[in-house]
Amino acid sequence: MYKQFKKRSKKPLNTIDENATIKVPRLAETTTNISVESSSGGSEENIPASQEHTQRFLSQHSVILAATLGRTQSSSRNIATLSRQPNNFFELVLVRAGVQLDQGDSLILACDHVPIVSKLREIFTSASSYTDKMETFKTGLNAAMAPGSKLVQKLLTGCTVDAAGEEQIYQSQNSMFMNFLMIDFMRDACVEVLLNKIEEVAKSDRVIMGKAAIPLPLLPLMLTQLRYLTASHKVEIYSRIEVIFNRATESAKLDIIANAELILDASMHDEFVELLNINYSSTEDLFHMTTVQTLGNLSLSDRTQAKLRVRILDFATSGQCSDAILPHLIRLLLNVLKIDTDDSVRDLIGSLRGIFNWRHTNETEKISASEDSKKSQLELFGFLELGLIRSKKFYQACQRSSASVPAAEFTSFDMILLLLLIHVNEDNSLYIENILRRRIKLEHITVSILEEIRQHYRHILEQHITTLMNILHDFMREKNRIVSDFAKSSYSILFKIFNSIQKNILKKLLELTCDKSSPHLTTMALELLRELQRKSAKDVQNCATLLIPMLDRISDLSLTQTRVAMDLLCHVAFPDPNLSPCLQLQEQVDMVVKKQLINSIDNIKKQGIIGCVQLIDAMARIANNGVDRDEFIASVENVDSLPDGRGKMAANLIIRTEASIGNSTESLALFFEELATVFNQRNEGTSGCELDNQFIAWACDLVTFRFQASFVTENVPETLKGIKLEYQLNINELDDTDANTESDVLNIGINISKLVLSPKVKACDSIYVLAPLFNYVRVLYKHRHQDSLESINALLGCAIVLPSFFEDDNYVSVFENFEAEQQKDILSIYFHTVNWMRVSISAFASQRDPPTRRRVLSRLGELIRIEQRMKPLLARAPVDFVAPPYQFLTNVKLSNQNQKRPGPKPAAKLNATLPEPDLTGNQPSIADFTIKVGQCKTVKTKTDFEQMYGPRERYRPMEVEIIMLLVEQKFVLNHQLEEEQMGEFLGLLELRFLLEDVVQKLEAAVLRHHDSYDADSFRPHLAKPEDFICDLLPCLHEVNNHLITLGEAIDNQLTEVSHVYSNLDLFKDQFCYIKSCFGLCVRLFALYFAWSEWSDKSQEQLLHKSLLKLQPKTQWKRLEKQSVPQLANLTFQYFLKYEKSVLNLSTAVHLHRLLCNLLKLGSLQSDASQPRFQQAEDLRILCGTLLRRKWFHYSGTLDKGGQCNIYLDELVKGFLKKSNAKSQTELLTELVKQCSILNTKDKALTSFPNFKKANFPLLFRGLCEVLIHSLSGQVSVDSRGDKLKLWESAVDLLNGLLSIVQQVEQPRNFGLFLKHSLLFLKLLLQHGMSALESIVREDPERLTRFLHELQKVTRFLHQLCCHSKSIKNTAIISYIPSLRETIETLVFRVKALLAANNCHSAFHMGNMINRDLHGDSIITPRSSFAGEENSDDELPADDTSVDETVLGDDMGITAVSVSTRPSDGSRRSKSSSRSKCF
């Protein structure tokens, strides 16, 4: 391959970099190290600045080559003998210059490039006929550059340098053609030949390749030769390239585009892009991958980038843009950051948001390779991250955009963008967290956004998951329930999405459980851990050992927290049989519960009981192998008869726990309640395990015997403590059975009175164990007999041993003649009776055979009647009487603390001294009391339709099964059923009772509203709230039917009274029950659809069924295929029609909440057909209609008070939410005309009859806040039109508020007006000055009018501050420094603006005299502090809800970053004490 006269080893050639020299040893026996010599910089200093431009090319290129190749040496070696003679003058010149033409695939040079160029120049300059020689050379070059020539690829590719006298051979990157271009007199001819050949090749129908062992496409090689001529021949090159491009084939065009950055001067880039736009009218053709990559490297003007941005948007939103090319389009868009102006950055963000939002709402999801998808997604956001790093203005604009974008436009892209912002600059993490926190509070962001991120940005989320986890960890600690719920649901979703972070999530949750500062946080973390274990048992089981340290924290937990923690630990220690158990955790749990059981401290022993129950449940659940359930009936004599296994272990643990409990009645009752709760839980959705059949049979026989022995009696009642007892309330005769059975049934009774009056020593015989034990019995029987309780149905209607006088008409008189101790015993008897009836009714409510159902309804009627009859007795009860406990979880100290709550003074005193009932079971001494009955007035108790139970009526909650009565029972519109209707129908009393119970359970499950008297109360239905929601599904249709019936009754009555809402017929008992039941139905639906888990995708099917149930049954089949948003829309329109049937303010508010929840459910999915904006407007109109009605209490009096104000406040917020300037102006105009009437005592507004002067600040505050809220939202939107128009309308509205303040002088209104005026002025300083600048020269008179209107406000503020200082009103004085500073800044800015535009006449500033609100001069401040109290104290006592905390956060200001808190009193303004206003 090389010269053949010299021996050398044939080593492969080394391709070198232009900036380095790689030396290769010539002799094989010589060993030298390869060295890389860095090129020297500063070689250009030897080139004269005065050298001609045409000569500088040669000089610069020669210097580069010299630096690259090292010291230039002349070759003393003779040229090798060629294998052939030169064919033409062109080849002869090359040979003479030292070029070998036919050796391999490249030209071999006898020396480096600079001597070659020198020899070529010498050959031509020394020739006699210079011009002819040049033409001959050009002809030969033209022939050599022909596509079919063997030399063309050699001329265009790098040469091999074999310099004589040097032990090196290297491959140069410069071609021979580049040597020709270095000679000034040859350059133009060579360029001409090159461009002609480029055109020839580009027009060819096929891709022309070179003639070499490895042929290469010729067009890219030819184009590369032009890269050093872009400055000297830019016009010529572009003009020819333009012609060539227009005539080239598609593949040739792509080659030209790919090399455009190198061959075209930067000044020609805009013209080239215009050429592309002309040639590619289709955006799909224009944005080829090659084109996009080239466009990203070109230097383009603003105008060209704007045109490209439009086409990019069209292409990205056309559905033709692939995921692979999108990152490069985004990179092309980000090139605008080179300009980095406010307008360009704003347009860029708008374009980015438009592209991402369109792709996620309109584009059908494509299935692509996961690796390709991951690569393109990471590449895309990598470009965005680089843009955020490169441009501070872009970073800040993205931050502001995410903070101010409307709620409807906040998408998963914005969420990812915020995570990127934190990643780029962690210093801003607190500010960005606050953005997210505020949006979550306002419910702009729900957990559904994580589902969107999982679908669209899974890979980038995984990259930034640590950042998100840190944010969620902080959000879990939030006191705001919405924020903490968001974090909780987010953890659950992330746990299912990413396996890699499951351990981290568990560790963070375990960390939160150890936080002693917040019990609520601990409870929430424990509940979330239990939820994760239920939904992802296998994943949690893999991390079982992480949970062991939780056992060390058990002693610090409350009893309810212990229940959740032990539920988690026990079911991980003893998981489903198909999962591997954690033996280490089993040993630790067993050891801990044994220690707790033998502990003498009551609370720790209860923890041990709760732990044992959870352990029993986990052990007793075995795999369901499809065994016939009839085998359950078989009896098991004792524990030893049970087969070895987990069932026998559970039975032994029950015996051990009972032995540890000993004679503690409270602990035994708690044990039975806990067992009933855990055994009653359903695990169909999370586990395939059921309780062991033989274990159930053993436990069932055991507790049945105990119950019969302790509480069922057949003895004749006797007189105890002077109280005559007898069998009462026996309804078993209603059962149609044979004579023998009936006689047996009629002879038994529940011995409640005897156990109260003469308690037994054993804890198992205590009256307090009656209800818990029966609850446990019925759960076991349902498991054993396939939900049938037929074998124990006699207990439902059997007699109860009660005092004989209770059925008398004068029972109150008889009760009052007893001694105090006897009265306590009698009341205890009836409390236990009510609790027994509640637990028995709940047990049999799910039984469907007609005789049992009749007894259930009859017993329910008796229960309601007894509870009503107890009300007058409780009113006359001894002061120290305490109702018997219905739950046994709360400690004594905790109970006393909970009872010390604010309220009426007598009740507070009563509750503070209540002793705890005796649960020891010790028998008191029996004495014979004589009774003297005297005359007493009959007492008629008035029904409270607002609150069903008073503070002393603490009854056991009904079980969940009670809802079956709502599903399967007929309803009649009577509050007192006829005799033949009893046992067959539900009346208004029964319906109200059932709805009230279900609503209370829903509040506990959905809103976590627990009993204020028993904060740690036993709530069986709360074990799994989702189960309760599922249980309610069947009854939705029936409750809706009841709602229709009640609504029709209300409408008919309204028609009869001609819609006069004050008519006395609307306040009769019968109609009040109808109104109460109607309100409870609406409240039930509102709570049901307020469940936070509806946003979880796993609940979508349940939500769909729930919404379908509320449609007419005839349309169910047709509507089955409707989406959730469509069904929510139909349901919204359905409930909206009930506005006319609402007669109570509380019902009106619950209807508003229901519609808000349905509106939110309609927004869970993206559905373009969903008319959400119209629904929001309908909701606003509804609130306005409700506010303009006069509301009356059930008693017929005008509704008022603190609760009324809270309801009115909620309607005001709904009415003013998102109202525009026009509606605000109309409302203000209306109020300005009417507000003067408020100065008259007890007069209300004509348009809003529920607002008097006392609660008018509610409405006024709403007007102030909606003005600032709407203004702050509009100033952040890009407005290209008249910017001053917005501020003119805002000042008009502010002056309307000023007019109201001046007419209705109320301290509360003064403070509200000052606070929001200060916010307005700060907004004007931040965003309004540009609007003033735009109008100052065009229309000075308009600016004058604006300043004049603003002057009215500032003058009043000045007078208000002076007046407040004179009367020492500290609430307003605290705002004065901040207000003074803001006004002075505004004055300075306005004066500077006018001075710069020579418009001084539009502004005048003078020193104002200090005056009070009535215009009188204030000479000296008053020394008295009589008026120093806060203005809030002037409001009446029933108006405490007017405080600003009631309003919440949803009317908060989004764009005002400057703090509006009252300034510190010590802060001094820099100006003089004399105020200056304009």
From Swiss-Prot:
One Gene Ontology term, aspect cellular component: condensed chromosome
Chain ranges passing through the membrane: none
Segments for region (Disordered): 33-53, 896-918, 1420-1478
Keyword DNA repair: yes
Knockout-associated phenotype: RNAi-mediated knockdown is lethal at the pupal stage of the life cycle. Conditional RNAi-mediated knockdown specific to eyes, thorax, wings or nervous system gives no visible phenotype but increases local sensitivity to DNA cross-linking mutagens resulting in increased incidence of mutations and chromosomal aberrations.
GO molecular function: DNA polymerase binding
Intracellular or extracellular location(s): Nucleus
One of the Pfam families matching this protein, by short name: FancD2
Biased composition (Low complexity): 35-45
GO biological process, one term: interstrand cross-link repair
Record keywords, A-Z: Cell cycle, DNA damage, DNA repair, Isopeptide bond, Nucleus, Ubl conjugation
Biased composition (Acidic residues): 1429-1442
Function: Required for maintenance of chromosomal stability. Together with Fancl, and probably Fanci, involved in DNA repair of damage caused by agents that induce interstrand cross-links but not agents that cause double strand breaks. Required for S phase checkpoint activation in response to ionizing radiation induced DNA damage.
Subunit structure: Homodimer; cannot be ubiquitinated and does not bind DNA. Part of a Fanci-Fancd2 heterodimeric complex that binds and scans dsDNA for DNA damage. Interacts with Fancl (via C-terminus).
Name of the featured protein: Fanconi anemia group D2 protein homolog
Species this chain originates from: Drosophila melanogaster (Fruit fly)
